[in-house]
């Protein structure tokens, strides 16, 4: 969600962005556990504004911070995985933790297998369907966990170790073909230290 309000001076406005792993649904709000980020960081707010302009056909898709499905999400995910593979190859301990509702996309599953074969330590927290096969020779460094709790785990949070300087993302897409290639869904990095420590 994007909002903008005046600051008393007709020429001054403050814009805000809210990016969540779920939506505002009164029926599921009492059952689902989600995360949301409410921010006025310009790089995130500007990207979200550009996304809405793109959906209206008024802007070319240019995103510097957000990862947006059908635009820059897949290339950036591949870059993040490649980084962890490179670190593992150098003996610096590649690390990936992914929390999501479903893992089904064959291309991304193959990337996780590849990372595992290079020694990247991977933890998957998948609530629903998981097409990745753990405990095989090609997935020996991958652990799959499911959380059973009072509320339905709905958050999508991705952690990439980045040699001790973690890159953490949250957003709406699961790793399914419909989410990664057909829908337009947004993922934001967690840039401030307090939310980083909370999600970590």
What are these regions (language model features)?
Residues 1-11, 200:
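Single conserved hydrophobic/aromatic residue that forms the stacking wall/gate
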Residues 42-43, 50-83, 166-198:
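Long, C-terminal catalytic modules of enzymes
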Residues 9, 16-20, 66-68, 80, ...:
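Structured core elements
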Residues 9, 16, 22-26, 37, ...:
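Short, glycine-/Ser/Thr-/acidic-enriched flexible segments
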Residues 80-143:
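Primarily the HKD phosphodiesterase
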Residues 13-20, 27-30, 43-47, 54, ...:
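Polar, glycine-rich mid-to-C-terminal structural blocks
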Residues 25-33, 55-64, 89-93, 137-138, ...:
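Short acidic (Asp/Glu) and glycine-rich catalytic loops that position anionic groups and cofactors
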Residues 140, 151-155:
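Short beta-strand or tight-loop elements
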């Amino acid at each position: 969600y994007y909002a903008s309000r005046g600051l008393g001076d007709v020429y001054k406005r403050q814009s805000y962005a809210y990016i969540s792993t779920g939506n505002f649904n009164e029926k599921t709000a009492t059952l689902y556990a989600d995360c949301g980020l409410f921010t006025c960081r310009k790089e995130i707010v500007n990207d979200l504004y550009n996304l809405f302009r793109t959906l209206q056909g008024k802007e070319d898709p240019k995103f510097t911070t957000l990862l947006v499905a059908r635009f820059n999400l897949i290339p950036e995910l591949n870059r993040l995985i490649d980084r962890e593979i490179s670190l593992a190859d150098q003996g610096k301990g590649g690390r990936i933790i992914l929390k999501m509702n479903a893992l089904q996309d064959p291309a991304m599953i193959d990337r996780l297998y590849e990372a595992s074969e290079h020694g990247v330590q991977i933890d998957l927290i998948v609530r629903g369907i998981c097409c990745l096969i753990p405990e095989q020779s090609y997935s020996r460094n991958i652990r799959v966990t499911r959380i059973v709790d009072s509320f339905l785990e709905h958050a999508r949070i991705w952690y990439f170790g980045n040699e001790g300087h973690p890159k953490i993302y949250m957003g709406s897409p699961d790793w399914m073909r419909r989410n990664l290639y057909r829908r337009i869904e947004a993922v934001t990095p967690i840039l401030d230290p307090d939310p980083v420590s909370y999600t970590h």
